[in-house]
Amino acid sequence: MLLTNAYEIAQYIKDAKKETPVKLYVNGQLAGLEIEEAKAFGTDESKLFLTTAERAAAFLEANASVITDSHLEYDRRNSAVPMLDTTRLNARIEPGSFIRDHVQIGNNAVVMMGAVVNIGAVIGDGSMVDMNAVIGARGTLGKNVHLGAGAVVAGVLEPPSKDPVIIEDGVMIGANAVILEGVRVGENAVVAAGSVVTQDVPPGVVVAGTPARIIKQKDEKTSEKTQLVDDLRSL
């Protein structure tokens, strides 16, 4: 289910059960020992439990006399939104990217290492989110968009009445550019690297600077420089 309304997302986060998932590695005399609602792997002498921090702590305290060693791993605290299950996507998702649940990713899209995609975001068919780029909550990329390395599409949850960022089809956004809340970037526009876009961008233009201004219409030379490579999107 895709959540794109700010009020719905806020309600979802409020109502979600906040958990701290952990991996608990334990050695000892563990025959018959279990943790409620946990997944367990291993033997009676050495086990891995997938559980929560609270249940892990209770288990360790209750069974201290038979446990010889333990180790706890975790990467979040009281998290409300899980990561997206990407196993069924017809897209290329590289390791080290962070994609939260309730995100929509189209066919042949690419999400590179270090990219962050927040709840309610949309990535259209054939679009690429390059290394360390960020798509904030409700940010929308159309089809065949390139979001350059380190670029930011600002998220909009607060204030909830503000419109999300919309990047239309065929837009090229250079490295480290920032698209601020509520901005719409028109079809086939180009945003130069390092630009800060504070207002809507018409289709088919090139903008640059801080704040970004129109510097020219997109021409043949610009199209050649910003051409997408289909081979990067093939699966």
UniProtKB/Swiss-Prot annotation:
It holds the Pfam family Hexapep_2. InterPro entries: DapH, DapH_N, Hexapep, Hexapep_transf_CS, Trans_hexapeptide_repeat, Trimer_LpxA-like_sf. Pathway: Amino-acid biosynthesis; L-lysine biosynthesis via DAP pathway; LL-2,6-diaminopimelate from (S)-tetrahydrodipicolinate (acetylase route): step 1/3. GO terms for biological process: diaminopimelate biosynthetic process; lysine biosynthetic process via diaminopimelate. One of its GO terms (molecular function) is tetrahydrodipicolinate N-acetyltransferase activity. It catalyses: (S)-2,3,4,5-tetrahydrodipicolinate + acetyl-CoA + H2O = L-2-acetamido-6-oxoheptanedioate + CoA. Keywords: Acyltransferase, Amino-acid biosynthesis, Diaminopimelate biosynthesis, Lysine biosynthesis, Repeat, Transferase. It comes from the Bacteria. It is an enzyme of class 2 (transferase). Its EC number is 2.3.1.89. Belongs to the transferase hexapeptide repeat family. DapH subfamily. Catalyzes the transfer of an acetyl group from acetyl-CoA to tetrahydrodipicolinate. NCBIfam families: DapD_Ac. This is 2,3,4,5-tetrahydropyridine-2,6-dicarboxylate N-acetyltransferase. It comes from Exiguobacterium sp. (strain ATCC BAA-1283 / AT1b). The gene is dapH.
